[in-house]
Amino acid sequence: DRRQRQMCIRDRLTIHSKSIGIHLHMPMIAGGIGVPMEKLRMIQNHAGGTFGYKFSPTNEAILGAAALICKRPVSLVFNMYQNITYTGKRSPAFTHVKLAADEKGKLLALWGDNFIDHGPYSEFGDLLTMRLSQFTGAGYGIGSIRNRSRTVFTNHAWGSAFRAYGSPQSFMGSEIAIDCLAAKMGIDPFEMRAMNCYKESEGTTIPTGFPPDVYCEEALFEKARPLYEAGKKRVAEKNAGSDGRHRRFARRIRLRSGRR
């Protein structure tokens, strides 16, 4: 009705947003542009799969400030440069990981010292930093873990939520360490992983000390082993037929865990 329409616009700032955390963002935006909460109205537009991108406010505060200054409806459309530079990015991690194993390759311990560069803002940086300690070494039964993770703030791009929150950063460190350890011990990297994956018979746990919901990795490695061996044979045959002129492009087989 007419009265309701007037109430919606009278001395009240209205912002349309595709936020996936609209009640979380409202106080952040209100505080940022100096508008009391009772004078700010947020309308959630339909949004598709954001993969975490809109777990952070992006252009809402800019729109709000522009509307207050212009005292009229405003619209903002980013060009490609602005879309790249004015939105949050996956925070880079700097991980230092050490692994210990017995003479057979069975993992005994993990030590880690990690940093998350979260850019200039603290928004959810603590949660992301926790992920480095939760996920580094995940997938393997490691009886002793000492892993310290810290957040640092810089003038780099501000950190936002991204798909597989913290997992790529964590697994980059521990999976490279697994490869290095396997190479030093002369153990096939596939077999090193199969030997140390979660096993219900051994009561192995995730890095936080809890058992996984499902013990499935052992069966997956058994299923993948013949495919892996066939792949190794195929790659060896192709490389053997090479004249060596393109050695840096030599074929190899890759292992991917597929974990998130």
Regions flagged by a language model, labelled:
Residues 3-6, 10-260:
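Structural alpha/beta core scaffold segments of enzyme domains
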